[in-house]
Amino acid sequence: MKISYLSDIHLEFLNWPDFSQESGGDVLLLAGDITTAAMIRSHRTDAVARKHSKYLSKFKKDLIDKYDAVYMVMGNHEHYNSIFKNTKQELIDGFARHDLSKIRILDNNTVKIYD
């Protein structure tokens, strides 16, 4: 079983790492500071929001779609410019809007991964 780990890519800073050569695998763990809930929930249509949307599409194609399962734990940046208790739902809603529902957020729960 291949489990990959990724953290601190900070998509909210509009700085895109190149994952196009990533081979994928069984499980991807996103270990925090991926993007802010405020940015992903945004309904803005300005240039920054459009660029962030483009990065999320690339994130899906170059990385998320290459894994059978994707789990995420929130870091501190996910909560920036959000109300702490709302962050998880804002991420879930934002991921759904960007066709990223495959990402399962772990928050005070666990998952067993079997080979």
Task: Locate the predicted segments by residue.
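Conserved catalytic scaffold of divalent metal-dependent phosphoesterases
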Residues: 11, 90-115
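Polar/charged alpha-helical tracts
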Residues: 61-65, 79, 89, 93, ...
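Short, flexible active-site-adjacent loop segments at beta-strand->alpha-helix junctions, enriched
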Residues: 34, 76, 109-111
